């Protein structure tokens, strides 16, 4: 039987991009849901940075109602570039010579502000803030219950963990799996350190970078194996700053950090010293890369990113409680940013899950649809098979980025993007 007499109600844990995309898709299909987020308010984590939706773009558009698709230009980093049909080239440069070393294979893509996209996806969604999940239990064959740290609780027919790379839902479901050797639910930390900023650069500097690419670029330092990432977050036509003749830019510098390294660079405690470190790491770089970093004001607030991942373990490593609970996105397959695919896999998770689940949630009790448990098991089979190699490709891309001689045509750092399983990187787990 496809469903029971219990009306479907989906508990969405996490109000990030994947959780909100899931909510909008359920709303589009008339399925009851509730969204719970541990943050106290939408602005708790700041404005956020950029997001590229590329090979999952078609799936993403299928999830959304038409009125939100029509408003997507509100989220674009550079609406003019999109209107002109510019996709960007996603080049990798040599920071010492300025030479273009690699070009990531082109694809149709949208570069959006993560914060503006999240705000758009909140349209019409009643997010319950300050809700940190603390326990999960199956209360019947078709119902699940979760409790929150404020002593409140919620019940539904399906709980979906969308609570990010350090997912509490993941930890709880792994502990409920009953495996003789429990799966480690904590992330693996890569031997790399990263400092990033969001800074408003004057047009005279930003336009030098825009001449290289209208959206983003990356670069490596052959002398140190340090790495540089740059992207635009807005332009003079779509910002509301007092000085409109500026471009908000995302600037990241990362470097290898070896366990046995005697010359490891430590991240300073004070913000002004972190910015000074970024300035010093750019010494010896050619223009415009050096100028961009040196122009970051010392009063800028930097952000430290811990580069972590969680290679999706085999099916059954977490309990889906008889098909009443599951994971999507970073909760199921946290990966580094070095292939820009985490969000795309999360979107595909939601799309695949909903495509199979909607017929079950909207069918009559006597329809021949699959059971919800069958659908969840099949979803997890596909998702774990697809995303484990994706996590490892992103790990290899990160490691290659910080070992300059490893950046070759075969490196995942510059190779094609997409959902495929044609390489074996299991050795990275040793």
UniProtKB/Swiss-Prot annotation:
Cofactor(s) required for function per UniProt: FAD
InterPro entries noted in UniProt: FAD-bd, FAD/NAD-bd_sf
EC number: 1.-.-.-
Binding site for FAD: 9-37, 307-330
Gene Ontology molecular-function annotations: FAD binding; monooxygenase activity
Record's keyword annotation contains Metal-binding: no
Pfam families the record matches: FAD_binding_3 (PF01494)
UniProt keyword Chloroplast present: no
First and last residue of the signal peptide: 1-23
Residues that carry a glycan: 130, 151
Enzyme class, spelled out: oxidoreductase
Keywords recorded for this protein, A-Z: FAD, Flavoprotein, Glycoprotein, Monooxygenase, Oxidoreductase, Signal
PANTHER family linked to this entry: FAD-BINDING DOMAIN-CONTAINING PROTEIN-RELATED, MONOOXYGENASE, FAD-BINDING
The protein, known as: Probable FAD-dependent monooxygenase
